[in-house]
Regions:
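A short glycine-rich, Lys/Arg-flanked "PGG" loop and its adjoining helix->strand segment in the class I
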Residues: 137-149
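Hydrophobic beta-strand segment of the Class I
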Residues: 22, 124-125
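Class I SAM-dependent methyltransferase SAM/SAH-binding core
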Residues: 52-113
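C-terminal alpha-helical "lid/dimerization" subdomain adjacent to the S-adenosyl-L-methionine
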Residues: 9-10, 156-211, 215, 221
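Conserved alpha-helix/loop element of class I SAM-dependent methyltransferases that forms part
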Residues: 21, 30-51, 66
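A short acidic, Gly/Pro-enriched loop at the edge of an enzyme's catalytic core
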Residues: 112-123
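Core SAM-dependent methyltransferase catalytic element
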Residues: 215-239
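Short glycine-dipeptide loop
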Residues: 73, 147-152
Length: 239
């Protein structure tokens, strides 16, 4: 069992190790649906025509690229991650894009101590980050700090399916088959055992919405995707 003190270092080293096969495993585990989920989140991100979008724990850049594809008005996208191998892959994928509609900059930084001024971005977003954090309240406070008044927070995360029967089937797959796939396909059983473990104590979608409200966000809403296995939460900074 990983202690709360050890978790940040453990998670960073884990993502450094799985970076080369991260995209492949996401596609295998979700049958490609993770691309659709990111596009759905991206539509929520660009709905207010933001000038600056901050993608935290951007990984290999897929959410940043989805935002670039969905945006109707020009915007600047800043992708932040603490894993150099992940950022290297994001930059390589960006370089290979045929059409670069808007600027994307990738930066190594700690999502709990962002090197950005107060009220400097229009949207803060992230995909599959929250389960890996030790202190959600600290993270939400930092996101609230860098958002401009009227700014939007959009997060996409694995969740507990609300329908009991399907939840049992999902847990059977997630807790047993996913680690086996990690072992057989990419030889990273430990990382893909950590993945379902990280969900066990994570709040369900309604409770995550409550945590956002308690951290000062307003107009909080969420919707389930992937038969209730993931959820996108949307919240606004009023002042």
């Amino acid at each position: 069992m990983i202690s709360q003190e050890e978790k940040p270092t453990y998670v960073r080293r884990m993502f450094d190790a799985i970076a080369p096969t991260y995209d492949f495993m996401n596609t295998v585990m979700t049958a490609g649906a993770h691309h659709l989920w990111r596009r759905t989140a991206a539509r929520e991100i660009v709905a207010s025509d933001p000038a600056v979008v901050l993608d935290l724990a951007c990984g290999t850049g897929d959410l940043s690229f989805a935002v670039m594809q969905e945006a109707m008005a020009p915007c600047t996208i800043l992708g932040v991650d603490f894993s150099p191998p992940m950022l290297d892959l994001a930059q390589a994928k960006h370089a290979q894009l045929r059409e670069k509609r808007f600027p994307i900059e990738f930066l190594r930084a700690d999502v709990l101590a962002l090197p950005l001024p107060d009220a400097s971005v229009d949207v803060v977003t992230n995909a599959f980050l929250l389960r890996n954090l030790v202190n959600l309240e600290e993270f939400f406070t930092e996101c609230h700090r860098v958002l401009r008044p009227g700014g939007r927070f959009v997060t996409l995360e694995i969740t507990h399916p609300p329908v009991p029967g399907f939840r049992s089937a999902f847990e059977l797959y997630f807790n047993n088959l996913v680690p086996l796939l990690g072992k057989l396909l990419v030889r990273h059983q430990e990382a893909y055992t950590y993945l379902p473990t990280s969900l066990q104590s994570f709040p369900n979608a309604p409770n995550l919405a409550t945590a956002l409200r308690d951290s000062g966000f307003a107009e909080v809403s969420y919707r389930y995707l992937g038969l209730g296995t993931v959820a996108v939460h949307i919240a606004n900074k009023v002042t």
